[in-house]
Amino acid sequence: MTMNETTSSLLEPDRDWWRGAVIYQIYPRSFQDTNGDGIGDLQGITARLPHIAGLGADAIWISPFFTSPMRDFGYDVSNYVDVDPIFGTLEDFDALIAEAHRLGLRVMIDLVLSHTSDRHPWFVESRSSRSNAKADWYVWADSKPDGTPPNNWLSIFGGSAWQWDPTRLQYYLHNFLTSQPDLNLHNPQVQEALLAVERFWLERGVDGFRLDTINFYFHDRELRDNPALVPERRNASTAPAVNPYNYQEHIYDKNRPENLEFLKRFRAVMDEFPAIAAVGEVGDSQRGLEIAGEYTSGGDKVHMCYAFEFLAPDRLTPQRVAEVLRDFHRAAPEGWACWAFSNHDVVRHVSRWADGVTDHDAHAKLLASLLMSLRGTVCIYQGEELALAEAELDYEDLQDPYGIQFWPDFKGRDGCRTPMVWESLPDGGFSSATPWLPISQSHIPRAVAVQEGDPASVLHHYRRFLAFRKANPALAKGEIEFVETRGSLLGFLRSHGNEKVFCLFNMSDEAATKELPMKRLEPLEGHGFVSEILDHEVKLPAWGAFFARLA
C-alpha cells in the first residue's frame, strides 16, 4: 500500500472533488515560521492547518518547497524530490499531509516543470559539454554568425531569453531568470524524468498539482522569431506594461501544440491514483482562455486551468466578469476553469481594484462572494480572508528580482508576499526573528486573532460564505446564465439539477435597485448580506448582494 492509499483513505474517494472546490494557496516562506529563522516552514503550515479547515476550504495548494538556491524563491528547483532545508524535511511533509487529511483537506503541490535551477545536477551536466548524456536535456542553440542570440525571444523577466554559456559556446533558453534554464521536453528522456517526479509525489500522498507556467513546456524546434504584436492588442495581464515582452506575439517560444500530448501522458499517471486533480497556470495575454480551453477539454489532460483575466490590472466591472465567463465557455464548453482574484504574483485585489472604494471591508466581502459564486473552482490566496492590502516596501527591502529589475514603474511581487499576520503583535505572530520580508504594520489590525473577535469581520464573512456555498451546490457545480443588468449590477442564475439560485451583486459604492427578473423567488439567508425587497424590486446597499432560490 502506497502512502497515498494510506493517508487518502481518511478522505472521501471522490474523483470529482476538484470540481467547484475552494483551494487555499499557501506561500510557505510567509505563512508561519516555527524555527526562528524568519522564514516560514512546513511545520508552520501544519500548525496552522486548523485555520484553513475552519474557513471551510476543500484543499490547499503549497507553492514550491523543493531544494532550491532561491533565486526565484523556490521556482528555481535544484532537486524535485526533496524539501529545501529552510522549509524542513520530507518527514515534515509527510506529517503535513497526514494532518491535512485528518482535517479533511486535500493537498496540492506546485510543480515547476518548464525549467529548473542552473544548480540542478541535470543542468550542471548538460552545460559541461556538447556530448554528455544530458547534453540535449535543455534548449541549447548556436549563435547567429555575428554572435548574437539565435532569435528574438524575450525573457518575461526582461532582456533576451537567451544566455551565453562559455563552456559549450552556445546559448541556452531561459523564459524567466538566467538562472532558470528551460528544459527540452522534445527529448523523451526529459519527459520520463518529469513523469517520475510526478509519480514520486503521488506515491508520497499528494492529491494533486498546480502546474506552473504550463503553456511554456515546449518551444518551436526551428527557433523561429516571434512576430511583433500591434499596440492595440497589447495588454499587461501577464507582464507589466513597462516590459517589452508585451510587444511580441508568443507563438513560437510557448503555446506549442506538442504540449497536448505531454499533458495526456501526465494525466495518465494521475489516473493511476484515486481522486487526483491538476490545475494549470496559463500565462498568455492574448490567448489565455483559449489555451485553458484546449488543456481542459476532453477529460484527458489537466482537470482545470486558470488564466490571468482576473489577475490583471484591468478594472473589475459587471461587464468584464460576464465577458470573461462567456469567453471561457466559448473556448471550452466542456472545460473547467479555476478562478482567482489574487495570488503570489500579482497585486492583492483589494488594492488593485480599490479606486473609488470608501468601505474597504464591504468591498472585500462583495468580491469574495462574487468569486465564490462563479462557475468554476476557486483559489483563495493566504491573507485574502483578512482583506489584506498590498504592502508598500522600500526599495532596500525588495527581494524579488522581477521588481528590482523594473523598479519603480513595476514594484514586483514582494508586496503580496509579506508574512501572514496571526496575532496583534509587531511580528504578527509570524516569527520570533526578523522576517525575510518586513511585516506591514497596516496589516496588524487585521490579524486573525483580531478578526476572530469580531463577528462582522471579513474573516467571519469568508467562513459564512464558504458554508453558504457548500449548502447550495448550484454555486459550486452549476451552470451559469447571465441576466440582463445595467450600471453597477451583475446578475446571473446558477443551475444544478433541480436547484436554481439567482445571484445579484452591486459592484459600486452607491446603493442600487433591480427589478427582479423572475417570479417565485425565495430569498436565501446565511450569506451575510442584507437587502430590501419592495414589490418586485430588490434594493442593494453599496457593495451589497442578493441570493434567492427559484421556487
Swiss-Prot record:
Catalytic EC class: hydrolase
BP terms from Gene Ontology: oligosaccharide catabolic process
Site keyed Transition state stabilizer: positions: D345
GO molecular function: alpha-1,4-glucosidase activity; alpha-amylase activity
Active site (UniProt): D212 (nucleophile), E272 (proton donor)
Record key words, sorted: Glycosidase, Hydrolase
Family: Belongs to the glycosyl hydrolase 13 family.
Protein name per its UniProtKB record: Probable alpha-glucosidase
Organism in which the protein naturally occurs: Rhizobium meliloti (strain 1021)
